[in-house]
Amino acid sequence: MLHIKCKDTDLDPIPVKIGIIGGSGLDDPDILENRQEKVISTPYGEPSDALIQGEIGGVQCVLLARHGRKHDIMPSNVNYRANIWALRDVGCTHLIVSTACGSLREQIKPGNLVMPHDFIDRTTKRSQTFYDGSATSPRGVCHLPMYPAFSERTRNILIEAAKELEIPAHEKATIVTIEGPRFSSRSESLMFREWGGDLINMTTCPEVVLAKEAGLLYGSVAIATDYDCWRMGCEGVNVQDVLKTFAENVIKVKKILVNAVGRIAKEDWSEDILNAKQCVCNNTMSGAM
């Protein structure tokens, strides 16, 4: 079982270890040096695939394919709890992830990159917490505040990485996560726009929630692959267009993630890491993770 010390005031530099969660094209182990596979079992079952541990520029990193390396796990069936638990268990302090999404805004064009800052959860079948009352879960009930939803400092690292590489990126967006695997109806797509959604995908929730509950600093790079189906007079989203646009832009995301790893490693994150853990402790009743 994982444990977090709720009153740890030791602010000596804490070594960072960065988890990278990717989809198709972003689970390439060649970005890691000195790589080794590690198979992990968790109290919540098996992760999507083996963890691949290694280094990027001398920085300890762990790669995990969200949908498995064969991309044979649909979004509803991803074991998000096992994925996050496994990455936390091997010592990750940060998670930087990629996600394909549809655009709900004219100005976010297919092929554009976006750093989401908030979410709307429309999933229906997914476990949202480690504190589920089972014999192997942490004790208590965690009422986790989800503002801010993402680690602002990690988000800013990703934004600065894109700027240094001269890769245009939208710096804010609210992402709607639907259950899938189907795409939205037109009425749903229009409704999400009215709600303030800018992007739509199938994986951010509960991944971002569980990462925060595990005390990890989470940031995401989203690739807009299509306009969903809200635009009148236009064909809706289809898988072939999604895959084509994703493949055309995946190298840009890889460059941003690699650059961000180096930037994260240059800074002292001790206070952020301890504050993230303290947030969990402060909002857990009758126990701590």
Swiss-Prot record:
EC number(s) reported in the record: 2.4.2.28
Top-level lineage group: Eukaryota
A GO molecular-function annotation: S-methyl-5-thioadenosine phosphorylase activity
Pfam families from the UniProt entry: PNP_UDP_1 (PF01048)
Marked site (Important for substrate specificity) residue numbers: 184, 239
Catalysed transformations (reactions): S-methyl-5'-thioadenosine + phosphate = 5-(methylsulfanyl)-alpha-D-ribose 1-phosphate + adenine
Binding site for phosphate: 24, 66-67, 99-100, 203
Pathway: Amino-acid biosynthesis; L-methionine biosynthesis via salvage pathway; S-methyl-5-thio-alpha-D-ribose 1-phosphate from S-methyl-5'-thioadenosine (phosphorylase route): step 1/1
Coiled coil: none
Top EC class for this record: transferase
NCBIfam families for the chain: MTAP
The protein's assembly and partners: Homotrimer.
UniProt cross-references to HAMAP family, sorted A to Z: MTAP (MF_01963)
Protein name: S-methyl-5'-thioadenosine phosphorylase
Source organism of this protein record: Drosophila pseudoobscura pseudoobscura (Fruit fly)
Species classification: Eukaryota, Metazoa, Ecdysozoa, Arthropoda, Hexapoda
